């Protein structure tokens, strides 16, 4: 929906044309459903199912999790339609963080969304927006929460806050940079995850993101998965890359102890 209240949703017939265009120009691709808030569309399951019938094999939903938490059976409905994974807005582990960033207490709602997704066997990635002085002291707690909720939580995707668009906060003198984010991870996990564990992005400029993958060996022990040159989420071929993403973010009991941390 648009900010002026007018319904600006793309008709499902137009989405079908977009699917056909993608399939004709190199598909099948991995499909990411974003917004706004995609779950505001009642026909979201039909959109996913239609894409599946056309041959697309991976669907990712970016969501605040409100409908997933409040509507009984909704997660299972999306799973049945063909959804693989949910990238869940998850800014922290206390209500105060959500009251500051989202205007309301949401921690119990987030837990309920995760429970419903896990029961539907949907993979989950936690997606925190990190803001200085708001939740940068909860980086370690977010990672611990993710580890405690495996195998359904497949990873954590940190996004330092950007000061443009609808963001009402003024740019501080100490913004969250990639080097600072890495230091926070190492310090707040007490060295469980180290700065040197992480590598730059492969498809984009390596200074724009970082990632590391681990195997959980016990309650407080992780094994860093070795990164090979040219591998990771951006592999040597597009088919390999798409398959890597599907395997990494979809729920699978085979990969119970594998988790990825990215920014």
Stretches with model-predicted labels:
Residues 26, 30-31, 60, 84-86, ...:
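Conserved C-terminal portion of the radical SAM core fold
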Residues 2-5, 94-100, 166-169:
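A short acidic, helix-capping loop that chelates divalent metal ions and anchors anionic groups
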Residues 42, 56-61, 65-87, 95-126:
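Active-site-proximal cofactor/substrate-binding loop regions of enzyme domains
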Residues 23-24, 52, 79, 147-149:
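Non-catalytic positions within long, well-ordered alpha-helices that form the structural scaffold/packing
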Residues 5-12, 100-107, 132:
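Flexible, glycine- and charge-enriched loops at secondary-structure boundaries
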Residues 37-39, 65-67, 92-94, 130-132, ...:
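Active-site-proximal loop/turn and secondary-structure-junction residues that shape catalytic pockets
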Residues 214-263:
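Radical SAM enzyme core and accessory elements
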Residues 1-63, 67-69, 73:
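Conserved alpha-helical substructure of the radical SAM core
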């Amino acid at each position: 929906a648009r900010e002026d209240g007018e319904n600006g949703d793309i008709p499902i017939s137009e989405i079908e044309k977009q699917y056909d265009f993608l399939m004709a120009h190199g598909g099948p691709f991995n499909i990411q459903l974003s917004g706004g808030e995609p779950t505001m569309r009642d026909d979201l399951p039909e959109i996913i199912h239609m894409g599946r019938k056309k041959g697309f094999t991976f669907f990712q939903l970016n969501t605040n999790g409100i409908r997933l938490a409040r509507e009984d059976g909704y997660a299972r409905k999306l799973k049945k339609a063909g959804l693989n994974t949910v990238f869940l807005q998850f800014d922290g582990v206390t209500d105060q963080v959500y009251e500051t960033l989202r205007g309301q207490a949401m921690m119990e709602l987030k837990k309920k969304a995760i429970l419903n997704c896990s029961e539907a066997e949907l993979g989950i990635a936690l997606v925190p927006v990190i803001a200085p002085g708001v939740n940068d002291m909860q980086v370690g707690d977010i990672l611990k929460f993710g580890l405690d909720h495996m195998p359904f939580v497949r990873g954590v995707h940190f996004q330092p806050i950007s000061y443009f668009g609808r963001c009402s906060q003024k740019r501080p003198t100490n913004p969250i940079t990639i080097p600072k984010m890495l230091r926070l991870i190492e310090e707040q996990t007490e060295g469980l995850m180290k700065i040197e564990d992480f590598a730059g992005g492969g498809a984009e400029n390596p200074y724009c993101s970082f990632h590391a993958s681990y195997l959980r060996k016990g309650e407080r022990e992780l094994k860093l998965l070795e990164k090979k040159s040219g591998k990771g989420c951006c592999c040597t071929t597009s088919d390999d890359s798409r398959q890597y993403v599907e395997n990494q973010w979809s729920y699978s009991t085979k990969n119970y102890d594998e988790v990825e941390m990215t920014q």
